[in-house]
Amino acid sequence: MNEIFDLMDEAEEPDEGKVTLCKVIKNADNPLTETSDKTGFFAWKLPAGELIELKGDVRFNDVVFGYVPEKRVLNKISLFAKPGQKIAFVGSTGAGKTTIVNLINRFYDIQSGTITYDGIDVMNIEKDDLRRSLAMVIQDTHLFTGTIADNIRYGKLDATDEEIREAAKIANADSFITRLPRGYDTMLTADGSNLSQGQRQLLAIARAAIAKPPVLILDEATSSIDTRTERLIENGMDAIMEGRTVFVIAHRLSTVRNSNAIMVLEKGEVIERGSHDELLEQKGRYYQLYTGQFELD
């Protein structure tokens, strides 16, 4: 994922006493201890040296943002997501769904309000470290010229072949990969033209699975995918969501019914929020969307 962000991001910001991410040894009865070894556990390291376990508690408080200052795209957005929760964003094109995800990644800085990650203002976290704690499965999956194994390995650069195979199994990608003549050694082109849309999405899920981040962002594919592949994708996503904070940009309401909270956005504001059943009872915009009285575009 870092390679993707390198393409999208500006020059590396200097270290000015900001919070960074470090590997730690985690024991039940002892404080966290920083280590250079591979442990599978990470913590935020404050400038004073204090270690805070990486969990994935994300909060927006009265966030105001515009791509140009005089035109607001988000107006006083407040939300929270705790580890293990799935939050879905629903709304028409231009409502602000993708913008919220961009701010979680800190692709842009907000005009006012606060965004915190495990209680730490994202402005105080090194961008590279912040994004190492996130994984994205987006509509247009980024693939690179190289083998299937290498493309999955972008989620964790030191991953072993065994870890790659296990991640592919979790993502329900192993079955189609092993049917290819060269299996995991199959060469891919940068545009992924030798794979179907569904297969590219399964590889993106495998890449997220191997990264094992506390926060997942899913932008559902809007293009047509056959029913069997769609079921594989949904099952793969369910497998890697467990225990993590998950944000979903929803294009089909059938996939968000089990969300802990659904936020209906319109013109940069949250006009409704609640569970699927709660929103149906309100008989508002979500009810209109679900019953076909109003359509997403």
Describe the residue ranges of each PLM region.
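ABC-type nucleotide-binding domain
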Residues: 9, 21-297
